[in-house]
Swiss-Prot record, chains A, B:
Catalytic activity: L-glutamate 5-semialdehyde + phosphate + NADP(+) = L-glutamyl 5-phosphate + NADPH + H(+)
Record has NADP as a keyword: yes
Lineage, opening ranks: Bacteria, Pseudomonadati, Pseudomonadota, Gammaproteobacteria, Alteromonadales
Function: Catalyzes the NADPH-dependent reduction of L-glutamate 5-phosphate into L-glutamate 5-semialdehyde and phosphate. The product spontaneously undergoes cyclization to form 1-pyrroline-5-carboxylate.
GO MF annotations in UniProt: glutamate-5-semialdehyde dehydrogenase activity; NADP binding
Organism: Psychromonas ingrahamii (strain DSM 17664 / CCUG 51855 / 37)
Pathway note: Amino-acid biosynthesis; L-proline biosynthesis; L-glutamate 5-semialdehyde from L-glutamate: step 2/2
Protein name (record): Gamma-glutamyl phosphate reductase
Listed PANTHER family: DELTA-1-PYRROLINE-5-CARBOXYLATE SYNTHASE (PTHR11063:SF8), GLUTAMATE SEMIALDEHYDE DEHYDROGENASE (PTHR11063)
Gene Ontology biological-process entries: L-proline biosynthetic process
Record family assignment: Belongs to the gamma-glutamyl phosphate reductase family.
Main localization of the protein described in the UniProt heading: cytoplasm
Length: 415, 415
């Protein structure tokens, strides 16, 4: 596996993609959609081998389900590709244009970033997602999926490359690191001559590894330790519905709720209601001491570190706070900066909350589950960024672009 | 030097700055301006000690001049502070606001980044610049200047801190790493719990060190290997003026010209003119073989690596290219992505150039010297970014901010 020459080829492909118009890029995406349909049997059969190997390796049912790419799911993926075709291409937009006093006609033009390296786990549909969103925005990409789906991914990338070739675009626009050697991830992170951005889509360990070992800018994200604060003025019935939605709808995703902070003035009344509402849904309350004192054996006492965990299951941390200030201090200390919200009917407190809390998404009286590219109307989602530079929160097509300044003069020198 | 507690204090200060209004931030800047005036003697005297130590250490006259902060220069710095007061505060702006079909009122709000770490060299005015631009945008900062100006910098930061205290803002909003121990830079780069962005302002070695050792996003920049391509259709007289401006006006800065590419059809005629125009200004032409063959002993033959160097002096690389394509290939290989331009009267070629070249700033018939915050009308400049994420080219106040998504619902759950 010669990663350097793979990087060089990706960079060269990126130069061609950068000057490819929307029509041709969309033709490439349609060719990919058709090729995925035409190669359905090959893809599904490679996936079956992955599933079989996963079973032999003793993977859990939940993980095996994430690996699965059957006919139905593949049809869904193809339909997603066609949705991306319909989205506007952000590349080429000019903005902040002005004629300066010094005579320079200046503007910013939106351009592709170049080469995007994506390291991800498990789900093979990510392979198609990332390839398609990168191509739509004129970026080349280098993909590195998990070892559990390597057979599926290799076939998928072959199909994509053949489709690219059929429309006259470089096959090297989408490349896959076919070895499961972990050292290659470390090598990829050092290839700043060829790769412009790294997106790790995976657990906290992968995020940390990329942050600490990359010479290339890394979009850290997808780790959600999310909070809701039920203020004393909250409409308790509505709060129960929002908390249930945030916790139960899809507990394994990053915008699911980890911790509910409850104002002490309502804790005695609200916490038993909370338990009555959530217990039938399978939720276990993990309570700090004050909440535990109220809930008794309806809750498990929280251990050290519990309030820093992304649960990814039906556990819910519960903590009684003395006031707004204590709620803010808790969020500041424990939030991963993904999504945090307040449930309140007090206008002043609500405003204060959105002024003070600095997470990628801050909510008043809404579920944290809204932090999502499609919910936000972005049409697509590459990742959810929890860092502060370049992009925050759900990243759509625009976040796969950068800009360049264009200055036009009539033979202009600086005075 | 306990860098961890310094970082913690900066983070805490950043929370307060983030909710401080423009009026109070401007009052702090005016207090700083007044304090710099009131402490002029103390500052100038500390700077004299730095200059004396520099002389004893055998620093060059050019470097000693960069260290100098006398009464006149300090007055200039104070005047710059008052200019920043007059600029609009980007913090708090809301944009991309929309009411989504799912009922969520969504917008992005511009907010401070948090804590900015800046590592810089030589010039003590950078201490004031960075502190003032950070405060204006509600960011705390941790500064680490060069050892040559440590006495000046310590006094400047003391003056700033006293001014902050006088208006009731945390002194820890601006902190200085008072030790010259190089290991502390490495430690700062790992403090991702407290620092949100690193800006290295210095030579290529510092930039590389930060990129390779930081867990925190780094804004790489300020290294300019800049090109102009004189196409065959160029107005030669005007081209001479632009090339002279780009090379000679201020050869030690990053937007100065490194390399002139000349179309072979005009090389025989243009290169001797170029020499006649630039030689009296002290420029030495460093030519590749074809250009050397034309220029003879009017040029020095380029050595390996010369076309990758940022000259920072009156040398100018000169290369004859066969056509547009060869010019582009040279720029792709050797440009640092700072500023590159074409000199031409051919509309099609000009357009092709700005489409194909992906540098932070791309010019048609204008000097590379325009790549500058004040020339671009940004009012201020924190750094010139040559990387592609977050900000490209001159970074003004807005580039010291990020955004958060604000979602407001009437007790809204995700369907």
């Amino acid at each position: 596996m010669d990663l350097q020459s793979l990087g060089k080829l990706a960079k060269e492909a990126s130069y061609e993609l950068a000057i490819t118009g929307s029509e041709k890029k969309n033709a490439a995406l349609e060719a990919i959609a058709l090729a995925l349909e035409a190669n359905q049997d090959k893809i599904v059969s490679a996936n079956k081998e992955d599933i079989q190997a996963g079973k032999e390796a003793g993977l859990t049912e939940a993980l095996l389900d994430r690996l699965l790419l059957d006919e139905t799911r593949l049809a869904g993926v193809v339909s997603d590709v066609r949705s991306v075709i319909k989205l506007d291409d952000p590349v080429g937009e000019e903005f902040d244009g002005k004629l300066l006093e010094n005579g320079l006609k200046l503007s910013k033009r939106r351009v592709p970033i170049g080469v995007i390296g994506v390291i991800y786990e498990a789900r093979p549909n990510v392979t198609i997602d990332i390839a398609v969103l990168s191509l739509k925005t004129g970026n080349a990409c280098i993909l590195r999926g998990g070892k559990e789906t390597i057979r599926s991914n290799i076939v998928l990338v072959e199909v994509i490359q053949a489709a690219l070739k059929s429309v006259g675009l470089p096959e090297t626009s989408v490349q896959y690191i076919k070895s499961t050697d972990r050292a290659l991830v470390g090598e990829l992170l050092k290839m700043d001559d060829y790769v412009d951005m790294i997106i790790p889509r995976g657990n906290a360990g992968l995020q940390k590894f990329c942050k600490e070992n990359s010479n290339i800018p890394v979009i850290v994200g997808g780790i959600g330790v999310c909070h809701l604060f039920a203020d004393k003025s909250v409409d308790q019935e509505k709060a129960l519905a929002i908390v249930a939605n945030a916790k139960v709808q899809r507990p394994t995703v990053c915008n699911a709720l980890e911790t509910l902070l409850v104002h002490q003035d309502i804790a005695e009344e609200f916490l038993p209601k909370l338990h009555a509402h959530l217990a039938p849904m399978g939720v276990t309350l993990i309570a700090e001491e004050k909440a535990k004192a109220i809930l008794g054996d309806k809750a498990t006492l929280a251990e050290a570190g519990d309030f820093d965990r992304e649960w990814l299951c039906l556990n819910l941390g519960v903590k009684v706070v003395a006031d707004f200030h204590e709620a803010i201090m808790h969020i500041r200390t424990h939030s991963s900066g993904h999504s945090d919200g307040i449930l309140t009917n007090d206008f002043t407190i609500a405003n204060k909350f959105i002024n003070v809390v600095n997470s990628a998404a801050v909510y008043i009286n809404a579920s944290t589950r809204f932090t999502d590219g499609s919910q936000f109307g972005l049409g697509a989602e590459v990742a959810v960024s929890t860092q502060k530079l370049h992009a925050r929160g759900p990243m759509g097509l625009q976040e796969l672009t950068t800009y360049k300044w264009i200055g036009i003069g009539e033979n202009l020198i600086r005075p």
